[in-house]
Structure formats: C-alpha cells, structure tokens
Amino acid sequence: MMLIKPSKLVKGITFISINLKRIMKSFLKYTFLLIIVSLLAYSCKSDNQSKDQNQAKTLEAKKPNIVFFIADDMYPWMFNNTTKGKDKDGKPLNLTPTLDRLAAEGVWLENMKVVSPVCTPSRYNCLTGNYASRANNESFTSFTKTNDGQTVIQWNSYIVPGEKTMGTYFQDLGYKTGFVGKNHIIESLSQVGEAAKPDLNADPKDPKVIKELEYRFTELQKDIQKSGFDYADKLYHNNPNWLGIRALAYQNTDWIAEGGVEFIEKYKDNPFMLYIATTIPHAPLDPDHSWKADRKITARGILDKAPNILPQPPIESIKKRIEEAGLEGKSRENLLWLDDAVGALFKKLEKEGVLDNTIVVFFNDHGQNFKGTLYEGGVNSQAFIWKKGGFKVGNVLENPVSNVDFLPTLLDLAGDTKNLNKFDGKSFKSALEGKEFAGRTSMYHELGYSRAVVKDGFKYYAVRYPKWATDFTFEQRKDTLQKYSRFRESFGEHAISKDPKAPYGQLEMVPGGGGAEHNAYLNHPNFSDPNQLYDLINDPNEEHNLINDPEYADTLKILKEELKGYISSLPGKFVI
C-alpha cells in the first residue's frame, strides 16, 4: 500500500479548496446572472402583458357608442332640411336646432322605408332586424290561427322577454345597454293583461293605485332587462292616453331625457348602446297635456320633484323661444321640446368627452300621412345617422333603406360581422362609407291584412281577409263594429264608423277601418281594392290602379313572384 506524504496531502486539500472556491464563485456568478435574466424576462413578459391589456382597452375604447333615438308620429314638414319643412320663401317651419345640426353634419336617409308602419311592428323591425311576421308571442300566434294561418301584423308583434334584440347583440360585444322612454314592444304585464287594469278615473295619489303602478313599472323594467338591456328606466309602457289612468295621460319629455342623461352618466366609461324613444309628437298634443303639462306627472306616477335636465323653466323657455321665432302653434312647441331632448343627449355626450366616439341615429317610427297602411304616405319615413366628421357618402344617402336594416348596420359599424346573416335586414355600412353597395333589388312591406312589394319603380299591393270574415252577415258586421266602438270608448276615444256596410279596414278588420288607418280610408281612392298596382315614378300618390291594364301584365307577374318569394320565407300564409 502506497502512503501519501503529509505535505502532498496538504497541497491536494489546498488545491481542492481553491478550486471549490472558484467553482462556488462561478456558480454564484452564473446563478446571479440567471436570476437577473429571469427577472428581465418576467419584466418583459409583464410589460408585454400590460401592453396587450392596454391595447385591448384601447380597442375596447374605440368601439363606437350608439344612441338610437326613435320619435313617434312625425310628419315630413317637421324636418327643416326637406322642401316640405320650409315655407314659400325657403324659411324653416320649425325651431329644431339639434335636428338641423344632424342634417348639416350627418347623413339624411333620403329613401327611408318602414316595413310595418304602426308603432309596435316598426319597433320590432328596429330592435330585431327582422320582419314582424316572425313575432312569437302567444297572442300573435293565437291570432294567426284564428285568421286561417295568415299572420296579421298590428300592435301585437311584441318581443317576448329573453328573445334576441339590439340589446343582447350589443351586450355580446361587451357593451352596456340602455332602454328609455316609450316601450310598446317588449311584452309585459301592461300588454298581456295579467294585472287588473286601474280604473280610467283612478287617483294616482291613492296608496293602492301607487302600489299597482309601481308593481307594473318594476315588472316592465325586469322584462326589458331580460330582453338585453342593463338599464331600463323612465318608461312608458304605451302612449300616455293608453296608460289606463286619465290623470297620468300627459306627455313628459323631460323625464325621458333625464333617463337618457342618467344612462350616459352611469356607463360613460364603457362602450354603450342607448335606445331612447319619445312619446311625442304622438297624441295627446294639446298644450295642457303636452308641453305645458306638469313635469312631475309620469307613467310611473306623480314625482316629488320635476326633472331638471332641459332648458328651465321648461314651459316658459319653450314659449319664449317659439314666440321669438314667430312659430307658435301647429305642435311646433312639442317639436322644440323633442329637439331639446336630443340636444340634452348631445350636451351630455360632449361633457363626458365621448361624443367624438358616438354614432347617433334619429328615426321617425313611420310615415304619418297614411299611417296604418302600406301606401307611400305610411311606409316613407325620415332618419339621420350622425358621427363626428360625418360619413364618406356625404350628407345624403340615396339608396333605399328599410328599418330592418338598422340593427345589422349598427352591428357592422361596431365591428361585429359574424351576425350579419342572421337578419331579414341588410347592413348598409359600405354605402355610408362611400363604397360599392349592392343594396336591395326590392322592398317588402307587411301590415294587418295587407302585403306589398316594390321593385323597379312599381308597387304591387294585396289585401286578403279570412274567408269566414268575408262571409259575415249584416248582423255580424254590426256586432263587430259595436265591439270595436266600445273598445275605443273604454280608453276615452270615439267610435270611427257607424256604418256596418262600410268596407273593412286593411289594418283592423272592422267596417270603416280602425283609427290609425282612417285617414287613408277616407282619402285613398283605391283603399278597398284587393289587388293594386302602381307606377310610383309617374304616380307617386298612388291614385291610378293599373291592376287591370294589360300593358302592365308582365310587370304584375314579376311583382307577384317577388312577393311570393318574401312570403314563402316567413311564418304564416298569404294567398297571392
């Protein structure tokens, strides 16, 4: 066995010790470097994550806010940008500075069409992007069965809470959504009659009545929230005359405007979509029940304090400005009141610094001259679309646009293209941007017992009643008329006709027609014709029915086939 000398052993241990120190030093050095590199990598990752999060927030912030403002029963002369809105000297007929701003800076939809020109189905078109024949509430589908399977579109095309609406589509995009003002579209207690109707002469200060009104209001709020709206307030379940209590049958645009402003205040830091609907200039329009009314009277009951959103003092301010403009009467005070409400939204958007990223739509729910029918005076309406800096198309869009097109267009403008094929409506975003736009080759309309299609300047118009109604005896027609008259009298309105032999209406199957269509019944020369054909270019007032003119036989055939195509894609029957 070989022995190691102590001196060599000491040297070896010393060598190992020195090398261990070097190794440890290197290890610590590289470990430190590794920690530094790891920290730097983590820091970079955090920076990248933070950058990504900031980019996501920036992208979120770039989503345009949407304000969809829908007015009620406006006439063409109420828009100063039109020839009908000016007097013979070219001066504006109305004091509407905010609407004038929309005309100057936004896009006027020159050929704005409404599918179903009365309140409820028009709102259905806007909020769903679909034709009202697709309504699925129980009263609508039951009524279809009683009419031999033919859908009859009236004030019955309610949206059932839970169905997809403008609200739900925008919620899916990360928007906060609001619903303010007139409802008349989301089904709730007030529509289906599950709660006892307060007496017409009930006292809104009576504790029992207050309790009932509050119950109805909160149930309506819940149903609207179920329909895709985070915020639902300052609501009218219907027009003031239909609230069930005479003492509440007053307009209150201040209250509605307050709801819009409160919504913007609450959700100004989020992308938001606000649907706001006024009850004017629909009746009641007499000063005492409209612009001169007590601002504490609302659909919810009597407020303790009046809203303080619009120019103050409200009545005096409107009166003074209208008198200074020399425009008293003819409901122009109500138009200024309406304009003030739109102006209040603009001011709030500007104050909160979100106006530059907001798209505003102003839409009149339907034509008023022949409301309740598919004549041009009913289906022609008015609308603006506004955004800061305008759209490339300029101030006027000539392309025909339907109110079912609003929802897909707004979704398209908000960056959602995946849902665009789910609607009867079509996006016209490309037209607004001045790009190539195929547009529509025809326009479809439906209301009551009538259907119509417009193509290449011609309109085919058909009216059909169930066979059992056409076989009615005189006594049955008389009974129908009496029931309808009692119904109108139940909410303070008068009977329309007293003649059981009068032709049925197109909207309501009663002799002499219903209230909404009565103007057309009295004044349209071909109202009672079951088949009508018009050359809209040469006969825009639809006075000459060409249905039996052999010269237009081929045109009629083409239009009938076009109408059949629409009807075959929708629920219900309609015989052409």
Predicted regions, residues:
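Bacterial N-terminal signal peptides that target proteins for export
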Residues: 20-32
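Bacterial N-terminal signal peptides
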Residues: 31-39
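C-terminal motif of bacterial Sec signal peptides marking the signal peptidase cleavage site
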Residues: 42-43
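Active-site-proximal cap/lid insertion segments
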Residues: 60-64, 71-94, 101, 214, ...
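Active-site segment of extracytoplasmic enzymes that catalyze sulfate/phosphate-ester chemistry
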Residues: 68-69, 75-165, 169-179, 188-189, ...
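Short, solvent-exposed turn/loop segments enriched in Gly/Ser/Thr/Pro and often Arg
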Residues: 82-83, 106-131, 138-144, 179-191, ...
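Polar, surface-exposed loop/tail segments
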Residues: 97, 126, 182, 186-191, ...
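Acidic, His- and aromatic-enriched active-site or binding-groove loops in soluble protein domains
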Residues: 133-138, 195-236
